[in-house]
Amino acid sequence: MNEQYSALRSNVSMLGKVLGETIKDALGEHILERVETIRKLSKSSRAGNDANRQELLTTLQNLSNDELLPVARAFSQFLNLANTAEQYHSISPKGEAASNPEVIARTLRKLKNQPELSEDTIKKAVESLSLELVLTAHPTEITRRTLIHKMVEVNACLKQLDNKDIADYEHNQLMRRLRQLIAQSWHTDEIRKLRPSPVDEAKWGFAVVENSLWQGVPNYLRELNEQLEENLGYKLPVEFAPVRFTSWMGGDRDGNPNVTADITRHVLLLSRWKATDLFLKDIQVLVSELSMVEATPELLALVGEEGAAEPYRYLMKNLRSRLMATQAWLEARLKGEELPKPEGLLTQNEELWEPLYACYQSLQACGMGIIANGDLLDTLRRVKCFGVPLVRIDIRQESTRHTEALGELTRYLGIGDYESWSEADKQAFLIRELNSKRPLLPRNWQPSAETREVLDTCQVIAEAPQGSIAAYVISMAKTPSDVLAVHLLLKEAGIGFAMPVAPLFETLDDLNNANDVMTQLLNIDWYRGLIQGKQMVMIGYSDSAKDAGVMAASWAQYQAQDALIKTCEKAGIELTLFHGRGGSIGRGGAPAHAALLSQPPGSLKGGLRVTEQGEMIRFKYGLPEITVSSLSLYTGAILEANLLPPPEPKESWRCIMDELSVISCDVYRGYVRENKDFVPYFRSATPEQELGKLPLGSRPAKRRPTGGVESLRAIPWIFAWTQNRLMLPAWLGAGTALQKVVEDGKQSELEAMCRDWPFFSTRLGMLEMVFAKADLWLAEYYDQRLVDKALWPLGKELRNLQEEDIKVVLAIANDSHLMADLPWIAESIQLRNIYTDPLNVLQAELLHRSRQAEKEGQEPDPRVEQALMVTIAGIAAGMRNTG
């Protein structure tokens, strides 16, 4: 174990040294000395030296406005480098990687050793594997794309430096390259100047596909195939594609007025353009590789006399011409030109697949399997995973927008006001119209801009090539009519196929009603006919936690899933649960394997569909090797959850969870909603107001510009509390509830739940992780620098609460200290704290200066503003999961 850490530590200190040299070259010895002094003070402050802690605070408070930015940048860049070293560590032969792709082998061996599972059962479970990862543009990815590219290259240098046999001159060359990259990063502005547009966000998503997934997915399938051959003697079929990627970038218009129908149309074209671009590179390689002459009669018949000399090349060159013509047409469309569709335009995956597969079969039949299973097989697998659309898009819109559109329409038609009808009347109207053969929308109707936008979006879906749009997600869904309304709007747009429409249940009440809503829908004959035995439901993690606190929310999510699984099973419907979880604990994030195995039994039968958000995309898919590792973890977890499902919780455990849920929700809401001091405290103790200035995502931070916590989006809410290290949304209420149940004499029952029920042990594990990242002296320092004295008692109360919570969690988990069973994560948090602490102290100081200036009516000092942005980005890097 320690050898693993020493490799990581030596990389971290080597990168730190290079950064130090860069700072010295750029700004001189005195700034480097200042940074070094602060680092040493921070280290001994962490080790418990109070005098040094005081000195650290004084030093940072006394920095001049000129020193603020370089010091903030030094620690922020250091954390980016530490994250890069850690990312490399997770895939290096000396580090964690030694164990990751092994996950599949371990899982297969574990399954084979179960007497009740035959090899055939395991094989069937593998064949039905389905994993759909939905990339979302969350503003939490605050690192600029240009810096991400440089960090990827730093990673590559670390990999080569790990090779013990490199010659001295190569070693020197690599070190020189590292110095260049770190200097380039230092001299690059790490804060975006402008908010990204939805199209920029989509391009960021395509960059992830190009730089990592394109190579990572075929590598993962090779790995999976090897493990299956070794352990089960089973080969994956060529067309097997368990992984799909979908994106919300350019499709998610919920609360984001910048995502319009035109934007979605543009992103769909852009996505197809990028696919042709990537496939052209693949085909170019195949043109040079497939120079073979021998072919089957079927292939020769396909190429005719003209191509008989080099049949494989002939087919590849033809495909290349079609791709080029398609790309040229898409390019013209993106520029706004209206061109007739060219002959041979590629719109369907089959058109890509058929010539490639014909070559594959012929090579296999002629004894050239070794060639068939090279680059050609990788390309075939990319056709199945990415295909013509590259990534599919989800459309997401809030339920009230559909209700308002239909209200405007019924008023125009003079048949009443849909918005004020009862649920039963709405359903009757919708079902009547869904069954009607005549159109509902009058030709000469001029709807409002809002309604026109909703109708135009449905039009885009109807016109898009089939297979390029994955699902229509309805946020804040509350009733069956919310789902039927979307089906009606899609029918009116002339959509010719059954588009999956997924209600998203995201508040506590909506989660509790989810099963009733779906039961009512499944009782409608017309609806049952339409969905053809398949239903997708999305479970919202972040908004439910913001609404009720993390303990009540997670229990409501569990129960909603459990009830939906049973309802759909009874109705013979294949249910896909779509999990909208974020990177941070307060938004449902948890280590993947643990999180999946803690769901109700049967929840992964319809496959896994999950959002991957913001910075988590980079941590989990930023490099091909990490992609292999993340996909392997998911694969192992899905197989295990489906073949060895977790136990049904005992009735007494459910009762305890009900109790915990009620108590924790009351405590949480008692502070967040009912305590009149809470919102002013939140606004002053965290950088919430300042966060709005960061050019983070393309969507506004608030659903409504004025208003309390409920109008804040879940992301800024969590982001703000992560910055001041109180991490409040991820624990408030949970520990108090546990304490109450312990006092009622049920500690041994809680210990049994922790031991034998994955759902409960994962909850406690997530609390431990949050407590390990939280920091009470820093949270207290923010109060002292920024909060009105009258509100100090509230801050103290919350900090005392957290201390009590830590004790009760450790007692139930039988641990002597936090993260006892995950020393690697504890180590990684400790390593980063030394660099994050000064940024926190500095941030409190900067907030103090900037708010003082505002109070005195002065213009904000650009150096202070810039340094503040840098601390926000740096702390986000230090916490590793921002919002």
From Swiss-Prot:
Domain of life where this protein originates: Bacteria
Entry-linked InterPro entries: PEP_COase, PEP_COase_bac/pln-type, PEP_COase_Lys_AS, PEPCASE_His_AS, Pyrv/PenolPyrv_kinase-like_dom
GO biological process, one term: tricarboxylic acid cycle
Keywords, sorted A to Z: Carbon dioxide fixation, Lyase, Magnesium
Signal peptide boundaries: none
One protein family per Pfam: PEPcase
Assigned GO CC terms: cytosol
EC main group: lyase
Gene3D superfamilies assigned to the protein according to its UniProt record, in alphabetical order: Phosphoenolpyruvate/pyruvate domain
Active site (UniProt): 138, 546
EC number, as in UniProt: 4.1.1.31
GO MF term (any one): magnesium ion binding
Cofactors, names only: Mg(2+)
Catalytic activity: oxaloacetate + phosphate = phosphoenolpyruvate + hydrogencarbonate
NCBIfam families given in the database record: PRK00009.1 (NF000584)
Family: Belongs to the PEPCase type 1 family.
Purpose of the protein: Forms oxaloacetate, a four-carbon dicarboxylic acid source for the tricarboxylic acid cycle.
The protein's name in its UniProt record: Phosphoenolpyruvate carboxylase
Organism annotation: Escherichia coli O81 (strain ED1a)
